Amino acid sequence: MTEKYDIAIIGSGLGGLSCGVILSKEGFKVCIIEQHSVVGGCLQSFKRNNTIFDTGIHYIGSMGKEQIMRQFIRYYGVDDKIKTMSVDSDAYETICIDSEQYQLPIGAKQFVDKLGQQFPEDKLGLSHLISKVMEVKNSIGIEQLRAGHISDASLQHYISVSAYQTIAEHINNPILQNILGSSSLLFGGEKQTANFYHYAMVMGSNIEGAHHILGGTQTIANAMANVIKQNGGTIITSEAITNIITSRTNEVQYLKTSKGREIKAQYYISSAHPQVTFDLVEPTPIIKKPFLNRIKTLRNTYGMFSVYLTLKRQTIPFKNTFYFIHANQSSWFDEDAMKGRSGESSLMLSFRPSEDGKWAESATLITPISPCDYSSWTNTHINHRGSDYEMWKKSVANIMISRAQKVCSGLSDAITHIYTASPLTFRDYTFTPQGSAYGLVKNYQNPLPTTIPTQTKLRNLLLTGQNVFVPGAIGVTMTAAMTCANIIGEEYLAKKIAEA
């Protein structure tokens, strides 16, 4: 059975859906193929005991009025379909080091003023650092779109600059250094490799305007999927791509699916991990073996262990902040040091509010984890990993809950149900190697090997997703626009988004 479309998109995460919305709005006949029964990828939410939990994206920056993520949401036509709530403007994040808590406010000036009061000897350096963060962050914005550019490429040289060293050059106090390093958890940053461009994009967007997605991030995915369908698009679920068939004319000929379907299109966009995508491509002399070998050997960022808690009603007051709880003052994940110590690394704790906004109805805890800690179950799949795996998960969850209890008194006694997910869970749902949370490691010391262009050697095969540009919601959104610009033109697309 052969089906023909203008655009065929592999994967329905934020990247795939964004490309689907953009191109379907331009009149292209779009088809998205998703291996799971539910669209969304890392936007997926799930419900347990009538409580919603997000799986991959827990809050989104630059979502305030006239900010870049809100502008894209408006352009997609889903702004009125999702409900957002600003995180506490005085404490969008609360950094916990030893017994002290440090609150990070929204707004660059407020950020510098508040931390400058606590670390007066570093206020000038902090001011310079945050100015640089916001300069990089502002390289994407509505003004750039109005000028016909998706981003200001002149600042992308910061990809070759160390995030950790840049912080250290501006800040002397080690505690403040680690407070500022907390954002590394949101893009998979490691002290030895993290680049300043990714750091600034993620941190800057949250300083600008971090927001909760009420009702769960699945509402974003569902709303975007509905726009695609309303524009005449097709979304196929519960069906995986098994082969990308190439022709002798340097292009993709069609896609093969797990149910025997053949999907033909003018253009093909893969939002899957590049290691997965190129494994699917039929051998062709156009894509050289050295390139394929390089892609296969690239290192991926760490995965996350997640604990989801339902709570007794009206027991824990809702705290409109995201807690980052650091062990031994260090906010940077050290894979070698944390081997065999699952649950003891930096921990993020967040709450979902009840309908009246006064109480927490659930809590989510996430922490980075070393791949060697779950390597015993690498060759297993969901619901078939055995009792040892369940015991290990329970042990890790208990460690994390015990640590969270120190900043949220009464948490343990308020728990009614506990659910867990390891990187293997994410691997099986998102098809990401090792369950990596943020895809390929982008090493500032040698960025070229992990610089993945949106255009492949195959004329009509494009890439999108967090491995191409910057991880996280804002990076994936920008990358999708860059991918689609190959088809409809950057200036045209940028100005349309700006005018939405």
What is each residue range found by the language model?
Residues 2-128, 132, 442:
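N-terminal glycine-rich phosphate/pyrophosphate-binding loop and immediately adjacent elements
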Residues 242-358:
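Mid-domain catalytic core of redox enzymes
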Residues 98-193:
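Rossmann-like flavin
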Residues 466-488:
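A conserved FAD-binding loop/helix module that cradles the flavin
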Residues 200-252:
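Helical element adjacent to the flavin cofactor pocket in flavoenzyme catalytic cores
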Residues 246, 489-500:
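Active-site-proximal substrate-binding core of FAD-dependent oxidoreductases
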Residues 314-421:
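C-terminal segments that line or cap access tunnels to active or ligand-binding sites in enzymes
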